[in-house]
């Protein structure tokens, strides 16, 4: 068999397990080259996937997947797993509409045992699977693979606390690729881990504990001595305190260390914790040198790497926010910025450099981020929490209980509102208008273009209470914001076009499509701007001289802005029909943003079609 054809023979982990162990390094080399070539053509998460090639091979070589459950945290590192579990050919459709998902997805493969996209869920899920197996009398393993960044979230520690008490038969693998909690790794650590994970060592360890149990002082002395020695060679004391047996750290790119260690741990019972050191971008120098740039990439030439865009490009909403944040910080010393580990994605790189003392990255900890902001607001500061819509869900109780209930002036700059594209249902921001608008004291805004986004952010600074500015991924109409920090009148919309008979009431990202549809329908078009407080006067005015009102929003139609329009009409006894256009009551799959909007009838043509179907039923 030629070296170049080794990967082509792997259509399932069973094929992998039939290989000679000496062939696995070659398989890793081929798999890494395949991922670089494949992702360069489709885009996707690259550096994190290159860092887990050997770990993925070792896991599928040792464990009987899918009978044994592998649970990947976040999912950014699942591409090698997908290739080895029968989806190699499908990788050419990665993150495309109707193609392979960029994250583990239960409906896609039995090897994807738990759907994921957000962080820090793996230990909880694997614990549930482990205890279910115990309850059903089934002999199978549950393994959670979690990154060091995801370990900063409280949910991970809640799960570990529970797992230690439950004495669950599970394995947690810490994929540590940032060296944030690790000493240097070398041969000594690998040898020690193989030794301490062996059956012989652990049988002797338990026998010794049993014997010393008859002499409690000696048992306590032995326990302290063991912890002291471990503390000298490995940072595992914290995990031992949770009731886990800690092993590592070991080199996550050394198959000769990984496989024997995993084989040993497979034989041991109870909660186990393996600390593995990997390198983001491993094997591709460009990604090794800049793992953040190559974390999530578009299409690129593998030989040249990511190239800077040529020519002027439209400002993205994220850039508009980042520029505003720096400008407002110069104008108002009360402003501070907070991000839950999304500095680059949320547009805070420049702010973090220019105002380092006013910039707070709290890690992957959305709950903490929101309440931390509340504490800052209590002391007279103006905290701005930059967060993706989908991640705001994780801090909902804190938004209600710690911010809104106390009417604290925290600004939420909510990026990725609406459909985000290739990342799919775990990352679409489809619910925020519904779940934030219902909270008392909140002011909720959605800009129609980049210039309006800047004005809304400035408006939020003037509001003595919590507010949210919600904007989409990418660029808008190309409107260039002025350098001024102008504001808007709170709760007032704007008529973009005067027509007759039909009024289109559009919110945020869909105003441009509504204006285009209004031209064809000769309809009035209103840019509503504020979801809360709604411009009730404008709604009543439009209801008085139009026979049909059409609400248009890139949010779940249930409980969204359209429902609020109907509430206003009902409270005033106005019986004008309302056609609500928005996202349907289902999770939207991945695909290009424009393609998804067209499919859901939220582009110009879809709006025209829906209105004509309502006014001229066949």
UniProtKB/Swiss-Prot annotation:
Official protein name in the record: 1-deoxy-D-xylulose-5-phosphate synthase
EC category: transferase
Protein function: Catalyzes the acyloin condensation reaction between C atoms 2 and 3 of pyruvate and glyceraldehyde 3-phosphate to yield 1-deoxy-D-xylulose-5-phosphate (DXP).
GO molecular function: 1-deoxy-D-xylulose-5-phosphate synthase activity; magnesium ion binding; thiamine pyrophosphate binding
E.C. numbers: 2.2.1.7
Catalytic activity: D-glyceraldehyde 3-phosphate + pyruvate + H(+) = 1-deoxy-D-xylulose 5-phosphate + CO2
HAMAP family in UniProt: DXP_synth
Residues noted as binding thiamine diphosphate in the record, renumbered to the chain: 76, 117-119, 149-150, 177, 284, 366
Gene: dxs
InterPro entries in UniProt: Dxylulose-5-P_synthase, THDP-binding, Transketo_C/PFOR_II, Transketolase-like_Pyr-bd, Transketolase_C, Transketolase_CS
Record PANTHER family: 1-D-DEOXYXYLULOSE 5-PHOSPHATE SYNTHASE-RELATED (PTHR43322), 1-DEOXY-D-XYLULOSE-5-PHOSPHATE SYNTHASE, CHLOROPLASTIC (PTHR43322:SF5)
Essential cofactor(s): Mg(2+); thiamine diphosphate
Binding-site positions, Mg(2+): 148, 177
GO cellular component: cytosol
GO BP annotations, alphabetical order: 1-deoxy-D-xylulose 5-phosphate biosynthetic process; isopentenyl diphosphate biosynthetic process, methylerythritol 4-phosphate pathway; terpenoid biosynthetic process; thiamine biosynthetic process
SUPFAM superfamilies given in the database record: Thiamin diphosphate-binding fold (THDP-binding), TK C-terminal domain-like
NCBIfam families: dxs, PRK05444.2-2
Pathway per the UniProt entry: Metabolic intermediate biosynthesis; 1-deoxy-D-xylulose 5-phosphate biosynthesis; 1-deoxy-D-xylulose 5-phosphate from D-glyceraldehyde 3-phosphate and pyruvate: step 1/1
Recorded family membership: Belongs to the transketolase family. DXPS subfamily.
Subunit field text: Homodimer.
């Amino acid at each position: 068999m030629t070296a170049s054809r080794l990967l082509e023979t792997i259509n399932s982990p069973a094929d992998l397990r039939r290989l000679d162990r000496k062939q696995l390094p070659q398989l890793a080399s081929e798999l890494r080259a395949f991922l670089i070539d494949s992702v360069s053509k489709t885009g996707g998460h690259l550096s994190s996937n290159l860092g887990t090639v050997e770990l993925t091979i070792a896991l599928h070589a040792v464990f009987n997947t899918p009978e044994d459950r592998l649970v990947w945290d976040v999912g950014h590192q699942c591409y090698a797993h997908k290739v080895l579990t029968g989806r190699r050919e499908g990788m050419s459709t990665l993150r495309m509409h109707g193609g392979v998902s960029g994250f583990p997805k239960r409906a896609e493969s039995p090897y994807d045992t738990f759907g994921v996209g957000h962080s820090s869920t793996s230990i909880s899920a694997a614990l549930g699977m482990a205890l279910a197996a115990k309850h059903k009398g089934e002999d199978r393993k549950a393994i959670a693979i979690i990154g060091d960044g995801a370990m900063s979230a409280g949910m991970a520690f809640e799960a570990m606390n529970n797992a230690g008490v439950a004495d669950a038969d599970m394995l947690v693998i810490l994929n540590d690729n940032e060296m944030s909690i690790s000493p240097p790794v070398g041969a000594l650590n690998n040898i020690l881990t193989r030794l301490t994970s062996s059956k012989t060592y652990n049988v002797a360890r338990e026998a010794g504990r049993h014997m010393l149990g008859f002499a409690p002082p000696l048992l306590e002395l032995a326990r302290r001595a063991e912890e002291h020695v471990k503390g000298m060679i490995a940072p595992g004391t914290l995990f031992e305190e949770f009731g886990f047996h800690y092993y590592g750290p070991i080199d996550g790119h050394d198959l000769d260390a990984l496989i024997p260690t995993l084989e040993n741990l497979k034989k041991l019972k109870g909660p186990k914790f393996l600390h593995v050191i990997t390198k983001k971008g491993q094997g591709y120098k460009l990604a090794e040198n800049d793992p953040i740039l190559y974390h999530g990439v578009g299409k690129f030439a593998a030989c040249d790497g990511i190239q800077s865009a040529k020519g002027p490009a439209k400002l993205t909403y994220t850039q508009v926010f980042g520029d505003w944040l720096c400008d407002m910080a110069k104008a108002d010393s009360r402003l501070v910025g907070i991000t839950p580990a999304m500095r680059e994605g949320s547009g805070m790189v420049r702010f973090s450099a220019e105002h380092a003392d006013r910039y707070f990255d709290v890690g992957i900890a959305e709950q903490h981020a929101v309440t931390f902001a509340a504490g800052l607001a209590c002391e007279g500061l103006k905290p701005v929490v930059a967060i993706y819509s989908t991640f705001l869900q994780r801090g909902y109780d804190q938004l209600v209980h710690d911010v809104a209930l106390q009417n604290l002036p925290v600004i939420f700059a909510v990026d990725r509102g609406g459909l985000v594209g290739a990342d799919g249902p775990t990352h679409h921001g489809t619910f925020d208008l519904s779940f934030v608008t219902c909270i008392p004291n909140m002011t909720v805004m959605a800009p129609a273009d980049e210039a309006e986004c800047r004005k809304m952010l400035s408006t939020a600074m003037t509001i003595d209470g919590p507010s949210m500015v919600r904007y989409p991924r990418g660029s808008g109409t190309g409107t260039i914001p002025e350098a001024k920090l102008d504001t808007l009148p709170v709760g007032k919309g704007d008529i973009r076009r005067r027509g007759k008979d039909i009024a289109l009431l559009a919110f945020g990202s869909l105003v441009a499509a509504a204006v285009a549809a209004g031209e064809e329908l000769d309809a009035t078009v209103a840019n509503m701007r504020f979801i809360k407080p709604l411009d009730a006067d404008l709604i009543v005015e439009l209801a008085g001289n139009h026979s049909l009102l059409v609400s248009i929003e890139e949010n779940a139609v249930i409980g969204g802005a359209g429902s609020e329009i109907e509430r206003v009409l009902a409270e005033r006894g106005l019986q004008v029909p309302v056609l609500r256009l928005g996202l349907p009551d289902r999770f939207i799959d991945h695909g290009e943003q424009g393609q998804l909007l067209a499919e859901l009838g939220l582009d110009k043509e879809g709006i025209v079609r829906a209105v004509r179907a309502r006014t001229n039923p066949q």
